[in-house]
Amino acid sequence: MERYFFGNNSGYGFFNLYEKELKSKDKVVLLKGGSGTGKSSLMKKIAKKAKSLGLDYELWFCSGDPQSLDGVFVKDKNVAVVDATSPHAIGVDIPVVKDVIFDLASSLDASKLQGVREEVENKMICKKQHFMRVYQYLKSALRHLYNQFEIEKQGVDEDKIRAYASSVARDLKPVGNKVRELFSRAICPSGESEYFDHLREKRVTLVKGCAYAKKVFFDEMSKLRKGVTLLLSPLDPTTCEGMICGTDAYVENPGHFANDTVIDLGVFGERYDKDDATEEANNVVLQTAFAVERLNKARQAHMSIEDIFVPAMDFENNDRILKEIEKLIFG
């Protein structure tokens, strides 16, 4: 079992990897239904079923609420079940043949929702406004990150880093020829959440150095190999902060896993104004903290919407839908 994020709060707004990820699946179950309709709970039950059958699976968590699931991928069946409401996976690739839609809103009792429209709309506006501020702060954090890059760039030998990355990449043994992109870390209402399951049973190499040196190293590594998994940066998803290739892992943070080797990019130069770089790095942290504060307020608004819909749900009907989905996946 491994845990990831396929959507993230970034300096570019909400960054979605679902469309690319789901194209490789044999079947995709798309769950419709708004807040409080039990999508995450249903997916957790599917994961529990997969575990009871001894099947390997992945949990895809929500960056807006890391206690909640956005998806579950049963790897041994190559089937994914995902939240299909905006801003998640919402498109249908091949209806019925590949993609199957289940609407959990069908379990709502409309008679219990009389007179709540204005309240719900006001709470949704409030949530939207909080997210607008979230992305303003993260956009500012991204600008400071690139300021930091520009400062550090003056003191590192970029050509030597790229040449070294090329030599490392040549020794890798890729699995297949596809490139998978995902997040092991996310910017969430409680701060940053990070999982390290992908490092289990891997030879872990810790990559050290200034932020720009690591960016250059991983950018070059990602260009030179297929058959790898790229761990993207939450703040700047156009760059990666780690790579898995077969039994080898190159990461900036090994978490609780002991690293087997270390690559210190500091040997390629650190002749830049460290005080200026540190100031920009601190500004990244500060602006991200402001974003996290707003994310928490957005989550509170979301939870207040759920509180309206949960009492109107017929969860026994959800259980019937669950049985249909389990039959579809497990037979």
Q: Language-model segments: which ranges?
A:
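Conserved nucleotide-sensing/catalytic segment adjacent to the nucleotide-binding pocket
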Residues: E2-G13, K48-S111, E119, S222-V292
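N-terminal pre-Walker A segment at the start of P-loop NTPase domains
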Residues: M1-K20, G155-F196, G331
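A cross-family "folded-core" feature that marks the main globular domain of proteins
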Residues: L31-K32, L42-M43, A50, E58-F61, ...
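An accessory alpha-helical subdomain
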Residues: E119-L172, A281-L328
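N-terminal accessory targeting/assembly segments
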Residues: M1-D56, T205
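Glycine-rich phosphate-binding P-loop
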Residues: V28-A47, S190-L224
